[in-house]
Amino acid sequence: MFKKLALFLVLINCSLIWAQQDSIIHLREVELSDTQLKNFSRAQNTTKLSDSVIQKNQASLTSLLRYNSVVYFKENGNGMVSSPSFRGTTAQQTAVIWNGININSQLNGQTDFNTLTSRDFNSIVVRSGGGSVIYGSGAIGGTIHLNNEFSFKDKFENHLRLDFGSFSTYSANYTLTLANEKFSADASVSHNQSENDYEYLGYNKRNENGQYQNTSFNWHIGYRFNSNNEVHIFSHLFDGDRHFSGTIASPSRSKYL
């Protein structure tokens, strides 16, 4: 009886205890950079659009690339859905890289170029060819890189641009740049809107339900510790409200938010 009782007490006192480790686990750092653009583009055809070229064109990224690159765009009208095509490939085979990060939609694998304002970036690079598959998403057509570059020198600049056009089309952009040898910061705010109610030639009708408006806020900050070490922070916010135009035969009043 005593042996059975002793064995029972031993069994109930034995248990497994799991708990956290008493030491700190050091995780490996993760680097997000666009070094592939520099390291793997020597044999690729690249076109770089500087800030001076960007400022001379319209605000939408579609308009900028249409007149300054070989990219063909399938667009449903001003401010409507716009998708690119490199050398006959589809929009899903074109990667859009924002400061080294692929921003193609996870749902349809493409980017609507009328939801991006070109003046929020100070460097845009168009890279053609199948070598762009290093960015994923089967980008055998090419890649479009939207970059915000840093300038670590004494600088304080303000830029304000206002545009007015037909059919109640308005565009505004303000950019602030502040930098010294250690610190660099850029911030920009853009707003675009239009009633888009143009007349159909040969018909006594106007384009209905084609209005749109969007606002974007972009900022990036960099700090240089020494000649070999820097830290960068990027942020981009976008808010848009867009309707879809109908056709002459059957006008539509549908709306896309």
Question: What are the functions of these language-model segments?
Answer:
Residues I24-K56, S83, I124:
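N-terminal periplasmic "start-of-domain" segments of outer-membrane beta-barrel proteins
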Residues A95, S123-R127, G131, T143-E149, ...:
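Predominantly transmembrane beta-strands of Gram-negative outer membrane beta-barrel pores used
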Residues L61-L64, S82-S85, T111-T117, V126, ...:
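N-terminal periplasmic accessory domains that precede
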Residues T62-N102:
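Extracytoplasmic beta-strand/coil segments of soluble accessory domains associated
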